[in-house]
Amino acid sequence: MRFSRLLIPTTKETPNDATLASHIYLIRGGFIQSVGGSGLYNFLPLGKKVLDRVRNVVKEELDKAGCQEVSLSFVTPASLWEESGRYEKYGKELLRFKDRKNNEFVLGPTHEEMMVNLVRQSVKSYKQLPLNLYQINLKFRDEIRPRFGLMRGREFLMKDGYSFHTSEEDMKREFDLMEETYKKIFTRLGLEFRVVEADSGAIGGSGSKEFMVLADSGEDTIVVCDNCDYGANIEAAVRQEKDCEAKAPEAEAGKVHTPDTTTIESLSAFFDVDPYYLVKMVAKRALYDEGKSEVVLFALRGSDELQEVKACNAVNANDLADISEEELETAGLIAGYMGPTGVPEGVRVVLDNNLKDATSMICGANEKDHHLVGNSFEGMEGDYHDLVAVQEGDLCPKCGAPMRYTKGIEAGHIFQLGTQYSEPLGATFLDENGKAQPMVMGTYGIGVSRLLAAIIEQNHDDRGCIWTKESAPFDLQLIVSNIKDETQVALGEKLYEALTAKGLDVLFDDRKDRFGAKMKDYELLGIPYAVVIGKKLQDGLVEFISREGLVKEEVSAEAILDVVGERV
């Protein structure tokens, strides 16, 4: 393709709202164009080329794994979402609207309901299963604050796949196959990534894994062990149970006057004990469907922090909200002196697993200026869950080595759904005995347009993009330094024809612009390799450039085709 005929509106100006390298360079390089700053983007020719290349990698690996591609309607009847129970639960990110006949619809942010509807009409027997269907299609989520370009837009291209099985064992087999398939996809795209345990969120299900592209700019905090392969999103990370070498408090069970000790720090100082032996109480309002709510006290050791996603899941709430001191008083609670026993009626208590059988604990007495000492949880019944946010240095649950935080970009997510959608939507099959059974499901997603941003977040420098081989819009850029030099132009045309004949996708920069401007554009666009025909041609030399590191090498004009054949 000739540069002079392509729409590539490069610019030196950085968008005002752009902070991430991917957002800056994709706009400046003319790959994408913002539609009024609303989290919507047009893909220009170069961006569409990259998008198609990434899409093809995804499609090729899925097809090899036996998946079948379909295309579902972007507009979804609201009735399907009502059947699954997600119409209200999904929240304001679900864009709802009515047509001229007053029928209700949504713009699909995900397509579990639509795919189940397709399969329940088409599959009747166990002989038709297993089945893995996928699409690579547009999605829309009405994000409250779309930001970071393609990283968190409102409309995006997503691969979403859904598998249907006769048993949980067969679903888990497919889940493992999809994990390996996703690894192949991200490896082909040249990405450094980590597969981590994850929270299932609004999709639901009993188990899920995320594919995190490692990048300092990532929104997600992940916990990893460098000694083994354990990794987890902070929302789902677990650890080995903590011990404490500090001496336990030696006090007989009783109530102690503790004025002005409303924090863990002040309580620790008052009793001269490690926070490990204190009970921290975190009050939240749990929000449920149909406007229902309740006050919940989450109890954990004073040395730990509450992980709110875990806490929300523990009470099966849609969300957790902070509670003011006035609301606490209305519920009969006293800020700074709350405890897990003797709570007012109507207040729910959830205990962290690390409190099971704990002894010598100090907790609030649910009475102003008083705490209880010598508390024991041995044999105490209660609603126990993992509520703790794993900290750096906590020990790996698999191998016992210290873990650390790192940042990642969620580029893929796979779920074991079970019968969560098939049962309410009536997706059944007849088994060998002619009995109707609900289909067991898995679902598998990849943010295809987000991958463009993820690739650049991991592969860029201060001059522009550095596309990986499988994602690059072109294999090589051919640059004629001086378009007025007939010898340079003649060699450029000859090389362009020869390289194209070899099957390479070449961007031929035949513009009349200054050589410096052409090189700036090459560095910004980030095509993996370039051949520059310049002044050294009079000595029989051209320049071969690798975009990564901008490594330059002089090569004889006669040998350049062989060099390109070896390197590109």
From Swiss-Prot:
Record's keyword annotation contains ATP-binding: yes
Catalytic function, reaction form: tRNA(Pro) + L-proline + ATP = L-prolyl-tRNA(Pro) + AMP + diphosphate
Compartments it resides in: Cytoplasm
Keywords: Aminoacyl-tRNA synthetase, ATP-binding, Cytoplasm, Ligase, Nucleotide-binding, Protein biosynthesis
EC number(s) on file: 6.1.1.15
Gene3D superfamilies reported in the protein's UniProt record: Anticodon-binding domain (3.40.50.800), Bira Bifunctional Protein, Domain 2 (3.30.930.10), YbaK/aminoacyl-tRNA synthetase-associated domain (3.90.960.10)
GO terms, biological process: prolyl-tRNA aminoacylation
Pfam families according to UniProt: HGTP_anticodon (PF03129), tRNA-synt_2b (PF00587), tRNA_edit (PF04073)
GO cellular component: cytosol
Family, per entry: Belongs to the class-II aminoacyl-tRNA synthetase family. ProS type 1 subfamily.
Cited function: Catalyzes the attachment of proline to tRNA(Pro) in a two-step reaction: proline is first activated by ATP to form Pro-AMP and then transferred to the acceptor end of tRNA(Pro). As ProRS can inadvertently accommodate and process non-cognate amino acids such as alanine and cysteine, to avoid such errors it has two additional distinct editing activities against alanine. One activity is designated as 'pretransfer' editing and involves the tRNA(Pro)-independent hydrolysis of activated Ala-AMP.
Self-association and partners: Homodimer.
Free-text note regarding domains: Consists of three domains: the N-terminal catalytic domain, the editing domain and the C-terminal anticodon-binding domain.
Name under which the protein is recorded: Proline--tRNA ligase
Species this chain originates from: Sulfurovum sp. (strain NBC37-1)
